[in-house]
A protein has these predicted regions:
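C-terminal regulatory/interaction regions
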Residues: 1-2
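Catalytic core of the metallo-beta-lactamase
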Residues: 5-12, 17-29, 129-143
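Pre-active-site segment of Zn-dependent metallo-hydrolases
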Residues: 17-20, 27-75, 87-88, 92, ...
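N-terminal Rossmann-fold NAD(P) dinucleotide-binding loop
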Residues: 82
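Short, structured coil segments at secondary-structure junctions
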Residues: 92-93, 134
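Metallo-beta-lactamase
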Residues: 103-143
Length: 143
């Protein structure tokens, strides 16, 4: 992008559908671009229309092509439509993963199952404490 200070939103899944939540946020200051990933979900196919298919995952090629620019991953909660693809994503991602305490147990289990580094999972501090991830400042609010 040529303009300074652009906020980008790239839904990889979860928009106009139920499940498969995965959202990329980007910030371009004109020199560098930083990304964060919010959620990493899957959806479950209808066996009537997709026999033999266990899970459907968003296309993560954008993430794979921009790995070094991803500063963090934030998981909102431990439902499969928000966390289910961690098993597969962590074949290649090395960014820290922030989530709540309960969600951290599920995330570590999924990453271990996929052969990734579960030490990347961090329990997010509650707001007003802020997590700095590249150009982003993120606060976790319990609902």
């Amino acid at each position: 992008m040529n303009n300074k200070n652009n906020l980008l939103f790239i839904p990889l899944g979860g928009c106009s559908e139920i499940g498969m939540n995965m959202y990329v946020y980007g910030y371009d200051d004109g020199k560098n671009i930083d990304y964060i990933l919010v959620d990493a979900g899957v959806t479950f196919p209808n066996p009537e229309y997709n026999p033999g298919v266990d899970l459907i995952m968003p296309d993560t090629s954008f993430v794979e092509d921009n790995l070094s620019k991803f500063k963090a991953i934030f998981i909102t909660h431990a439902h499969e439509d928000h966390i289910g693809s961690l098993t597969h994503l962590f074949e290649y991602i090395e960014a820290p993963i922030y989530c709540g305490k309960f969600t951290s147990f599920i995330a570590k289990s999924k990453i271990d199952k996929g052969g990734g580094n579960s030490d990347l999972v961090k329990i997010a501090p509650h707001y007003p404490k802020i997590i700095k991830a590249g150009s982003f400042k993120v606060g976790f609010v319990n609902i």
